[in-house]
Amino acid sequence: MRPAGSRNPELEAAIADNPSEDAWQVYFDWLQSQGDPWGERGNLALARDKAKGAAKAKLTKQIAEFDAAHGDALFGASLLELMKNDYFTEVAEVSEQYGLFWTVRVRSPEYDWSGTAPSTALAELMKSPAARLIQQINIGLMDHDPPDLQKGVDVLWEAESLPNLRSLFIGDFEYPDDTEISWIEDGIDATAMLKVAPRLRSLHIRGSGIQVGTLEHDTLERLILETGGLPEDAVESVGSCRLPALTHMEVWFGREGYGAGGNVEQLAGLLAGEGVPKLRHLGLKNGDWQDDIASALVHSNVLAQLETVDLSMGTMHGNGVEAIIANPAKLSHLKRLDLSDNYLSNNQVERVKAALGTIVEIGRQKKPYDRGGGDLRYYASVGE
């Protein structure tokens, strides 16, 4: 039996796009014809899933015996050694399909963690012959002091290509419980991740100083950038994106004091609907210039194709609110308009409700910070 590792991009893509039993059967038969142990291992797992009673128990035993005999070839000797550590599951959560890794989540479980490093676990998982079809990777905090994501990102970058990856979440942590967003100072490069995963469908990045270069990708359907300070060049990249498959976009802009820059003019291409023909949900939120965003969106070309809009968590209190109130016909086709966590006055809330009815979500509204003498300050919800 040859070492595991035979690759067939066409069959792998078929499973990634539609993991039906028939697709798996064809794939495992091909692997078996190549002498790859995952062919026999996969066919045993398929047969077990169809079996019942004593036959199922027998196949379960056969699989355990097969894994014991061929574990190094199936999973890699170094990963098997690492998995013997009782603490491995504290840093790595792995789901599988017929034994092959399907989803992976890695993170440091506690502040003073001294067990297996999450980045080490991820590196060994990614090198494993069982990792060839991984669909989803979630990267949490690699360290707590200082908070770090980059070590996990570096592992993915070293992989060079992840052709079957469909979903990537960098920054899978709870804030502020685990850390503040602004404390993540890695400056994750969204564009680099898109290059590593040519068939990615969902990219979610949470952290500070997110970098965005030329934002072009053929298959990305969902993009979420959560930050307390999106740099000006990143805003410009979002505004000029070319994402023909994108249906869901959510961007947090943040506060100037935490690195936020840019202005609504730099979003002109996006608001014109250029490069995003399938976009149905648009969240432009958590901004210091939320009024400008709201006013521009009301008069934009992209609005007509949207089903839901999220303008929450910002500083909206003036011309943006008035633009919404004055143009209900342009917004009435929406299923939902989220204006929560802004600075709408009670009077504005009542007028918005009267204009748009049940499609608008008001939620909680903030009160401006009064520095005295009529000096009112308005802040986006998440900076730090």
Name these PLM-found stretches.
Residues 2-6, 12, 35, 45-49, ...:
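Long, low-complexity intrinsically disordered regions
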Residues 6-9, 41, 164-165, 202, ...:
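Amphipathic alpha-helical scaffolding segments comprising HEAT/armadillo-like alpha-solenoid repeats
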Residues 298-300, 308-309, 317-378:
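Leucine-rich solenoid repeat modules
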Residues 78-88, 102-117, 138-147, 169-183, ...:
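Concave beta-strand-loop units of leucine-rich repeat
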Residues 2-126, 130-136, 383-384:
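Long, highly charged low-complexity segments
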Residues 4, 20, 36-37, 52, ...:
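Alpha-helix initiation and capping sites
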Residues 88-92, 96-102, 116-127, 130-135, 146-158, 160-167, 179-192, 195-202, ...:
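Leucine-rich repeat
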